[in-house]
From Swiss-Prot:
Broad enzyme group: oxidoreductase
Higher taxonomy: Archaea, Methanobacteriati, Thermoplasmatota, Thermoplasmata, Thermoplasmatales
Record's protein name: Digeranylgeranylglycerophospholipid reductase
Taxonomic source organism: Thermoplasma acidophilum (strain ATCC 25905 / DSM 1728 / JCM 9062 / NBRC 15155 / AMRC-C165)
Residue positions binding FAD: 14, 33, 44-45, 47, 100, 124, 162, 283, 295-296
Pathway where this protein functions: Membrane lipid metabolism; glycerophospholipid metabolism
SUPFAM superfamilies documented for this protein: FAD/NAD(P)-binding domain
Textual note on the cofactor: Binds 1 FAD per subunit.
Any single Gene Ontology cellular-component annotation: plasma membrane
Subunit structure: Monomer.
Listed EC numbers: 1.3.1.101
Length: 396
């Protein structure tokens, strides 16, 4: 049997950040990763804002940054004038395009340097509970089953998260309309603008969008995400993306060198994400932005918050629901309002026709985005396209 103050299940950005901060707080910390290699396989567009690195005290390093972009462009179905957002206005997925595998390894190394133990190829097999409190996990490590006892467990086991369900948290179960199926190529020999990440809306990606994340030197991540309510299987999803690439002048002569697929949760903030002795972070806590599908930044922030409350709980020997809810309060304050707004937008956008989407993009592209407001958009739409105001009022 092994004993720790903190057990972190999962070695992604949320888990590594939680482990790093817990270790920095002087807590004996173990992080486990089920795969033999942290950061692999990559299932992500690899976009991240600069601000999150600063907030989490992560020094930008060219070893894990493939490209730095100025902003994002959002195209309507006609692909005429796009909405252009500078990086500071474009959200948590715009600023850097990462080498995600190297980034995840870097974060794990920071956790280890802070004092955390790291075990790879060590999946959690079950939850250990004592008197209603999560008290550790059964782990397969070095071909043995090991009981690891911990005062606090932080579950960062991603979209496929099992640990929370094993412990009895039902909130992490997703409705079908809150699951996106995603497929992405890494492409070479492409001709795309290296200064902007591009997003394409409309029937080319039903109830979702297509993205192009430039990585520099003729390389880009080109992917599609669509609701599983609209796409029946990944072959259909692949056909949509292949059709887009064939018709894109800068992509059609490129070659794909990697194909990755996966699922993404796009729900409102779900509670509870704690119980005595357990907190969920990142994708495991369903903290993916419902409109962008991005989750790296939210995973990092939630990992920081989890470590902060863990420190307080261990120092006071208090693992009550009231203590655990301090973490939930931080999560709600940071994410709840934004995720609700973006969830409503996601649901509404899925129902808009290509013609209406074009009109919306046309209006917003004309606005001065430093002073943009709901009132300004509605007024502009009423003046130019009065027939679609009713259709859009719930969205904006």
């Amino acid at each position: 049997m092994e004993t720790y103050d903190v057990l972190v299940v999962g070695g992604g950005p949320g888990g590594s950040t939680a482990a790093r901060y817990a270790a920095k707080y002087g807590l004996k910390t173990l992080m486990i990763e089920k795969r033999p290699e942290i950061g692999s396989p990559v299932r992500c567009g690899e976009g991240l804002s600069k601000g999150i690195l600063n907030e989490a005290d992560i020094k930008a390093d060219r070893s894990f940054i493939a490209n730095e972009v100025k902003g994002a462009r959002i195209y309507g179905p006609s692909e005429k004038r796009p909405i252009i957002l500078q990086s500071e206005k474009a959200g948590n997925e715009v600023g850097y395009v990462l080498e995600r595998d190297k980034f995840d390894k870097h974060l794990a190394a920071l956790a280890a340097k802070a004092g955390a133990d790291v075990w790879v190829k060590s999946p959690a097999l079950g939850v250990i509970k004592e008197n209603g409190k999560v008290a550790g996990a059964k782990i397969r490590h070095n071909n043995e089953i090991v009981d690891v006892r911990a005062k606090m467990v932080i579950a960062a086991d991603g979209f496929e998260s099992e640990f929370g369900r094993w412990a009895g948290l039902k909130s992490v179960i997703l409705a079908r309309n809150d699951i996106i199926s995603a497929l992405q190529y890494r492409m070479i020999n492409v001709d795309v603008d290296p200064d902007y990440t591009d997003f394409y809306l409309g029937s080319i990606a039903p109830a979702g969008y297509i993205w192009v994340f430039p990585k520099g030197e003729g390389m880009a991540n080109v992917g599609i995400g669509s609701s599983i309510n609209w796409i029946h299987n990944r072959f259909e999803l692949k056909n949509y993306l292949d059709r887009f690439i064939e018709n894109h002048p800068g992509l059609k002569k490129g070659q794909d060198i990697q194909l990755v697929t996966g699922g993404v949760s796009v729900s409102k903030v779900k509670m509870p994400i704690t119980m005595p002795g357990l907190m969920l972070v990142g994708d495991a806590a369903r903290l993916i932005d419902p409109i962008t599908g991005g989750g790296i930044a939210n995973a990092i922030v939630s990992g920081m918050y989890a470590a902060q409350v863990t420190k307080e709980a261990i120092e006071s020997n208090d693992y009550s629901p009231q203590m655990m809810q301090k973490y939930e309060k931080l999560i709600k304050e940071r994410f709840e309002r934004k995720h609700l707004r973006n969830w409503v937008a996601k649901e509404k956008l899925a129902m808009l026709s290509d013609d209406t989407l074009d009109k919306l993009v046309d209006i917003v592209s004309e606005q001065v985005l430093t002073t943009i407001s709901v009132e300004a958009i509605l007024k502009a739409i009423a003046e130019k396209y009065p027939e679609v105001v009713k259709e859009l009022e719930d969205l904006i």
